[in-house]
Design a protein with these regions (language model features):
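Pyridoxal 5′-phosphate
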Residues: 1-304
């Protein structure tokens, strides 16, 4: 079988699995405990935090470990402080449901949500973004790379616009992490969501980059783990696996990106040249290396 659904999930890397096993068998201490087993777990978590941070050029203190992209996105949308009673959030019409569904509920609770439309390639109009920002805007959230058509947004430009207006900018980079280089300092983003299982790590763990100085109110309260931003006993094995996956992704990013891009372009050429009435969806140039999305006229997608 040829697996072509890596946008949905990836196979766990053998080295990732190996790194996790000791924390499922022998090193089972609670990271909040002060005894030796607890200290070993804490040390493993902090090492992983550094590995995660290194992949996106963040400081380890800026990494909040979560259960995945969905929780990271919800944490931002529900945790960002409101400007006033008339606050609004700006996002796009083609976000993942992990953004759209919380926005829908927030809207039902009285918060104004502004949805930016996209062009035929799935790209937002940055001029429209500028025009929609007001004194009441408390957050802009635009997906980095689209999970369906693969379009990569102009993140640096969006960051610049938001910073000129002094608005925090969040991007959902779950589909982008490990596929193309991400440097949060260079991009200028304030908040960024990532997930382990999209880059050959385990499911059920992810992270939220929170730039130093950005305030987020906690969504999960309890024992005060993750500097009080996400309470709950840490899943040490999964966090260790996530860290290892980030390390592997960083070490192989340039080589893998070139190889996958070459395969993608070959697939696109073969399909467009060899099959009639086919349309390539998404931006033809600004797209994820691992994404090729087509419409075959008269053919149901599920049947295909």
């Amino acid at each position: 079988m040829i697996y072509l659904d890596n946008a949905a999930s990836t196979q766990i890397h053998e080295d990732v699995l190996t790194s996790m096993l000791p924390y499922l068998k022998e090193q089972y201490g609670n990271a909040s405990s002060i005894h030796r087993y607890g200290r070993m777990s804490r040390k493993a978590i902090e090492k992983s935090r550094k590995q995660i941070a290194s992949l996106i050029n963040a400081d380890p203190s800026e990494i909040l470990i979560t259960s995945g992209g969905t929780e990271s996105n919800n944490t931002v949308l529900r945790g960002i402080p409101m400007v006033n009673a008339s606050s609004n959030i700006i996002t796009s019409s083609i976000e993942h449901d992990a953004i759209l569904e919380p926005c829908k509920q927030l809207s039902q609770n009285g918060l104004e949500i502004k949805y930016l439309q996209v062009d035929k390639f799935g790209m937002i109009d940055t001029s429209e973004l500028k025009n929609n920002i007001s004194d009441n805007t408390c957050l802009v959230s635009i997906m980095f790379g689209n999970n369906e058509v693969g379009t990569v947004q102009k993140i640096s430009k969006i960051s610049q616009i938001c910073h000129e207006k002094k608005i925090p900018f969040h991007t959902d980079a779950v589909q982008t992490i490990g596929k193309i280089p991400i440097d949060v300092k260079e991009l200028g983003v304030d908040l960024l969501s990532i997930s382990s299982h999209k880059l050959h790590g385990p499911k059920g763990v992810g992270a939220l980059y929170i730039k130093n100085g950005i305030r987020i109110d906690p969504m999960i309260l309890g024992g005060g783990q993750e500097h009080g931003l996400r309470s709950g006993t840490e899943n040490v094995a999964n966090i260790v696996g996530f860290g290892k996956a980030c390390e592997i992704a960083k070490n192989n990013l340039t080589e893998n990106m070139a190889y996958v891009t070459k395969l993608r372009d070959l697939l696109i050429k073969k399909v467009l040249d060899g099959i009639p009435e086919v349309t390539l969806n998404g931006d033809p140039k600004s797209r994820l290396p691992n994404n090729a999305h087509f419409t075959f006229l008269g053919v149901n997608g599920e049947d295909l």
